[in-house]
C-alpha cells in the first residue's frame, strides 16, 4: 500500500527520498499510460490486467527488500507500471460493462469501490505492519495482488464478459 511508504522509508532511514519515490512512480504512470491504452484497445483487457498484477507483485516484493536508494526507485518504477496498467484497465472495464446511459454511474462506482478498498486495506494492513513489520506486510500485498489476478480470471474472463475484445 502506498499509504505506508513514508513510514517505511523513515524506518529505513531513506525518508529524504520519499518524494523521489513518488515522483518516479507518477512519471512512470504518465509515460506508460499511452502504451497501456494501446495494449488494451488492440489486444483486450488481459494484455494489461495480467501484466499489471505481475508488475504490482514484483514491485511490492522488491519494495519489501529495499535497503538503499536504487532499489527504492526501481520498485517505484515497477509499481508505477503496475498501477498505470491496472487503474485505467479496470475503469474501462467498469464503463464498458454498463449501458452507455449509465457510464457516469459506472465510473463513480469504480472510484467509490477504489476508495473503499484503499481505506479498508490501509486499516487491515496497518495491523499487519504493526504485528509483523513492513516487509511482511508488502509480501501480503504481493500475495493479495496475485490472488486478485486469479479472481479476475475466474470472475471476469471466464464469465464471457470480455469487453473490448
Question: PLM ranges: what are they?
Answer:
Residues 15-16, 100-110:
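Loop-to-transmembrane helix entry/capping segments in MFS-fold secondary transporters
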Residues 127-145:
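A membrane-interface helix-boundary motif in multi-pass transporters
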Residues 85-98:
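Intracellular juxtamembrane helix-capping segments at the cytosolic ends
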Residues 32-44, 129-130:
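Helix-to-loop junctions at the C-terminal end of transmembrane segments
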Residues 47-62, 142:
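Structural signature of the two symmetry-related core transmembrane helices
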Residues 20-29, 114:
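Transmembrane alpha-helical segments of major facilitator superfamily
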Residues 1-8, 12-14:
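Helix-loop boundary and gating motifs at the non-cytosolic
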Residues 64-75:
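Helix-loop junctions at membrane interfaces in 12-TM secondary transporters
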Amino acid at each position: 500500500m502506498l499509504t505506508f511508504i513514508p513510514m517505511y522509508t523513515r524506518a529505513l532511514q531513506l525518508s529524504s527520498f520519499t518524494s523521489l519515490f513518488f515522483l518516479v512512480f507518477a512519471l512512470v504512470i504518465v509515460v506508460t499510460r499511452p502504451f497501456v491504452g494501446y495494449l488494451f484497445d488492440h489486444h483486450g483487457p488481459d494484455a494489461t490486467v495480467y501484466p499489471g498484477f505481475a508488475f504490482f507483485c514484483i514491485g511490492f516484493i522488491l519494495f519489501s527488500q529495499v535497503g538503499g536508494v536504487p532499489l527504492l526507485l526501481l520498485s517505484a518504477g515497477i509499481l508505477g507500471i503496475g498501477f498505470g496498467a491496472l487503474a485505467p484497465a479496470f475503469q474501462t472495464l467498469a464503463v464498458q460493462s454498463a449501458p452507455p446511459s449509465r457510464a457516469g454511474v459506472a465510473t463513480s462506482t469504480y472510484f467509490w469501490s477504489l476508495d473503499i478498498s484503499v481505506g479498508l486495506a490501509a486499516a487491515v494492513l496497518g495491523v499487519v505492519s504493526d504485528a509483523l513489520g513492513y516487509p511482511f506486510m508488502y509480501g501480503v500485498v504481493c500475495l493479495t495482488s496475485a490472488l486478485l489476478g486469479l479472481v479476475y480470471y475466474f470472475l471476469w474472463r471466464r464469465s464471457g464478459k470480455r469487453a473490448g475484445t
